[in-house]
Amino acid sequence: MTTGDADVTVKNARIHVEGAIRSAVWCGGESHLKVEDSVIDSKDADPFDNDFRSLSVPMMKCVPFALGLDGNCRATNVLEAGQVTYENSIVVAEKWAPLSTDSGYPPTSLTVKNVLAGVGALEEAVPGKAYTATKTVAGKTWGYTMGGSGYVAYGDGGVTNLFEDCQFY
């Protein structure tokens, strides 16, 4: 998580989160976050669990029902004038929003280069097992299997998202 005017670089990291509104990467304020050679994924909370049902927060705890999607944990959430750059990485959300901006204003943005991003499941690749896609990051090969109901990338009006040499599923 970055906020204020922070300038942070994350390199060769493995970030995995589970639970409602527990974004793996959260960037707000006027901060800059660069993620390189890393593997990021998020897994939803069980929406029928009592802890989830009793959760009261001042923000969305799941994707709006009217969108016809399912999910309660984004892999990336960029807010305000935050800026996130991903390079040579994997970003997966189990059901909703691997790469998302929310309630931002210019220049809130994502810059995404040479990234595999998708909605579904991620694991260290098992030889001989079929995957939707595989990608090697920092010397380790990962297997991605498409699933879930959500979008890969989303940007609020007025923001800029740039994508180069990416695989979206």
Feature map (PLM): residue ranges:
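Extracellular beta-helix/beta-solenoid repeat scaffolds
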Residues: M1-V8, N12-K43
